[in-house]
Amino acid sequence: MKLESTRQGKRLVPGDEFFATSQYFSSFYYNDSHYEPLLGFLKDVRDQGQYGKFEIAIENDLPHAGKDVKFERHALLMEEPEESQWFFQNDMVDYASDPEKSHVVFQVQTGKGKTKCALKTVVRRQKRMMLITKSSFLDKWAGDITTNLKLKPGEFYRVKSGSQLEGLIDMAKDGKLDGRVGAKMIAISSHLIEGYINGYLESGGPVAPWELLKVLGIGGIVYDESHMLFRMNYWSAMFLNPAYILDLTATIIPSNEFEEARFLERFPMEARYDKLAYEPISDVYAIYYGMRDHKKVSRINRMRMYNHTEFEKILFKGTKETQDYYELIDSIMQPWYFKDRKDGMKCLVFFGLVESCKDFAKWLDRKYPKLKVRTYNAGDNYDATIKADVIVSTTGKAGTAIDIPGLLLTVLTVPVDKKSTNLQILGRGRKDQIWGKTPVMAYLVCRNIGKHVHYHRQRMSLFKGCVKKHIVLNSSRMV
C-alpha cells in the first residue's frame, strides 16, 4: 500500500530498512499491517499543525489478476496415491491452490517436496507466475521448471540482468509475451528486483514497481527460501503488490524481537501451512579436536567477533596443520561414507572459504583418484555438481535450497551461529529410500576455541527433537 502527502517534499515519517521513503515522489511505502498506526500518526501531525495544513491522500492499489495460462505438457503427478510416501503433499497443494487464498507460506521441513508442491500449485492456479529467489538458486530452479513443466522456448524466461528485465518489459508492452507461444513462468533474483525498486525510488522509470506485474501479466509470485535475503523479499512483496504469494521456507526462526515482528508481517500466522510434524531423519555427531599452536589459538580467541574465514586463513598458513585438518575430515568420511560405499552415495563437505573448498577438493582428488570430487561455488555448474561423489562447498552456496540425491554424509567444518542456517544444513540429508541408511551430519568443534564450543552447545539445544541422535565424540587428533 502507498500513502502520499499532498504537501511536497516532506518526509512525515522516517524510514528504516523495512520501510521506504522517496524524496523524488514525496511518498512513504510500508507493509499493510502498518496502515492504521501510520494513518493515526499522520492525522496527529496534521492536527497539531507543526507542518502547516496538509491533506492525506490514500491510494489502495488493487493487485492485477494476471494472464491466464495452461501447463498442458507438465510431467507432474498431480494427485499422489494413498499408498505413496508423498500422499501428504495432496493436502499442501489443495491448501495453496484455494482460490480464496492470496498468501500461503509452506512452513515445511526440508525434504518434504516444497518445490514439487509449488509447481503443482502453479499448474492448478493457471496464471502466469514469477519466481523470486537467491541468484545462486536459479540454476536449480531453471532445471526443475523446464523438467517438470516441460516449457518450450518463449514460455519460460530467466531474467539475469537489469537490461534483460527492461527488454522483457518492452516485449510485454508490445504484446510479445502473449503470442501463440506465450510466457508462463518468469524467474528472477531477489537482488535484481531490489535493484529495480531502488532505481525507481531514486530516479523514477517507465514502469512503477507496483505496475510491473500488471505490465508483465503476472498473477502471482513464488518466493523460494524467502527467509533468506529477508529484507529484499519483504520489500519486493510490498512494492510489487502481487495478487498471490506462495512462500517456501523451512525455517522461520527470528533472531530478535524486531525480526520476529517483521516475520509476522511478512509471514502472517493465518497464511502458514505448518500441519506436518517434524520428522527426525539424521544422526548428528559433534567431533572434538585440538590445536597445537597456542599463539594461533590465542589470536583466534581474541577476535572481538568470531570470523571463520579468518580462522581458516590463520590455520591453513601451516602446511602440517592443513594436512592434519584434511586428514581429520578424511577420518570422518571413513566410517560414514567410504565404508560400504555404493555407486550413487554422496558426501557434502562445507568450508568457510572458496579457496579452502578448492584446495581440499584437489587434496581429496589426489588421494582418491577414482572418486568424482567437485566444488560447488560461484561459476560451478549445478547439474554437473550433483553427479559428483563428493561435493565441497560453502554454507552460503550449498547450505540451502539444493537437493543432492543420495547424500548420506554432511561434514560441516564451519561453526554456524544462525539457527535457520544450522537447520537448513541439517536438512541437506534426506531419508534414504535406496540403501536403508540413516544420513549423518558431522560437525567439527575445536576444544581450544571458545566460540566453537559455544556454538556446539547451541546446536545441542537447537537439534533436540530434530535428529534421531546427537552424539559428542572426543577425538585425540590435533592440527
Language-model segments: residues:
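Conserved pre-motif I regulatory segment
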Residues: H64-V105
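Conserved Walker A/P-loop ATP-binding site and its immediately adjacent core
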Residues: T110, T115-K116, V122-L149, G352-C357
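Conserved helix-turn-beta segment of the N-terminal RecA-like "Helicase ATP-binding" lobe
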Residues: F137-M171, K367-L371
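Conserved helicase ATPase core of P-loop NTP-dependent helicases/translocases
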Residues: E166-K173, K358-G396
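Conserved two-lobed SF2 helicase motor
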Residues: D178-L201, I386-T400
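Post-DEXD/H (motif II) to motif III coupling segment of the RecA-like Helicase ATP-binding lobe
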Residues: G217-G220, E225-A286
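Conserved interdomain linker/interface between the two RecA-like ATPase lobes of SF2 helicase motors
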Residues: Y273-C347
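Conserved RecA-like P-loop NTPase helicase motor core
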Residues: A378-L462
